């Protein structure tokens, strides 16, 4: 490992990468539709394609033992090459399955939990807590994750599109939110909180954006996230750069208040150090962190699994990027939970 680090054989994002993530709360009970996903799971992919600027890199990983024959590995590589060069998936010809059922789970309980959380905030037991709810859908045939993935890539080009596949369940989504990125001696994070819809015209879109930039409620919500992330970054950085005012980050249907954060990392601080410190952010958990998690655990009657959790990759140099797993669904055959 030291040899690779010292000689910089691989550009960032290439070579043997670890891909995976963590559950939102490892102390929460596990539900059946998350049975393929442990509290943490990482893997090295067999085939990886990475695009860095205008250059593409193909990485093929294989396990080699001293007694193995060279021919065996050559044959293996040729089989992998055939797989990589196979015909591109044509999502346009796919016919969407028929939606049979759509159920909002625990609506009344969710409303009651909002009232309880509001009471706790008024009593100053917590500054902010974010509660989630579920939507369950069922189709007439198995859901094609390839089709969903292609649609997300096409419709959400400014988001991080991801899929983690298990034996029975698949977690898929398109998140706009970076948790942390490490590049050498520098680390980057994103404060993304406060939102408003996109406009139907360019003028309406501009006016809505300006309204968001001046809205007191959304600015306060955003400042809570900025404050928490700044505190976390200061713990592990020599210096931290944060703009004084947020700007706008626009996706297809919504625009957010956005503040980028950059820091120069102290020695012996790893990417996982930042993940542990930053997760969960106030936008998906609450503030302060230690007070918010037990409240979520008590009020929510379901397992978030890997929803709103850190997902990403790390290379052999210790660089990498993790996002927050939102705008997502866990899919199992004909059913999905959003």
Predicted features along the sequence, with ranges:
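Non-catalytic accessory segments adjacent to catalytic cores
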Residues: 2-128, 132-134
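A residue-level signal for conserved active-site and pocket-lining positions in enzyme catalytic cores
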Residues: 20, 49, 124, 180, ...
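Short beta-strand scaffold segments in enzyme catalytic cores
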Residues: 47-50, 161-163, 172-173, 178-179, ...
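Cytosolic ligand/metal-binding cores
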Residues: 52-84, 174, 181-252, 327, ...
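Active-site pocket-lining segments that scaffold enzyme catalytic pockets across diverse folds
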Residues: 91-178, 225, 229, 236, ...
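Hydrophobic alpha-helical scaffolding
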Residues: 100-107, 138-142, 198, 215, ...
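Generic, well-ordered alpha-helical scaffold segments in large soluble proteins
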Residues: 116-120, 151-155, 195, 211, ...
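Conserved hydrophobic core element of enzyme catalytic domains
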Residues: 175, 258-338
């Amino acid at each position: 490992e030291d040899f690779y680090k010292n000689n910089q054989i691989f550009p960032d994002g290439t070579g043997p990468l670890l891909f995976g993530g963590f559950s939102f709360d490892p102390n929460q009970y596990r539900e059946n539709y998350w049975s393929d996903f442990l509290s943490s799971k990482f893997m090295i992919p067999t085939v990886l394609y990475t695009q860095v600027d205008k250059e593409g890199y193909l990485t093929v990983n294989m396990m080699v033992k001293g007694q193995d024959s060279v021919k065996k590995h050559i044959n293996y590589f040729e089989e992998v090459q055939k797989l990589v060069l196979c015909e591109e998936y044509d999502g346009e010809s796919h016919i969407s399955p028929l939606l049979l059922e759509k159920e909002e789970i625990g609506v009344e309980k969710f409303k009651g939990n909002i009232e309880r959380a509001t009471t706790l905030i008024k009593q100053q037991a917590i500054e902010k807590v974010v509660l989630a709810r579920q939507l369950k859908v069922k189709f007439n045939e198995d859901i094609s994750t390839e089709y969903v993935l292609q649609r997300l890539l096409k419709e959400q080009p400014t988001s991080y599109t991801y899929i983690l596949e298990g034996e029975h369940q698949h977690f898929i989504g398109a998140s706009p939110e970076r948790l942390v990125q490490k590049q050498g001696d520098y680390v980057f994070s994103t404060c993304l909180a406060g939102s408003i819809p996109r406009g139907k015209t360019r003028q309406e879109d501009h006016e809505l954006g300006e309204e968001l930039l001046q809205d007191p409620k959304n600015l306060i919500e955003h400042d809570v996230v900025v404050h928490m992330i700044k505190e976390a970054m200061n713990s592990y950085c020599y210096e931290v750069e944060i703009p004084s005012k947020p700007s706008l980050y626009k996706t297809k249907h919504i625009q957010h208040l956005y503040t980028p954060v950059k820091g120069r990392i102290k020695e012996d601080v790893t990417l996982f150090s930042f993940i542990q410190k930053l997760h969960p952010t106030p936008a998906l958990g609450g503030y302060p962190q230690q007070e918010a998690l037990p409240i979520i655990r008590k009020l929510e009657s379901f397992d978030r699994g890997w929803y709103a959790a850190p997902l990403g990759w790390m290379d052999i140099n210790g660089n990498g990027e993790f996002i927050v797993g939102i705008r997502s669904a866990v899919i199992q055959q004909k059913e999905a939970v959003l």
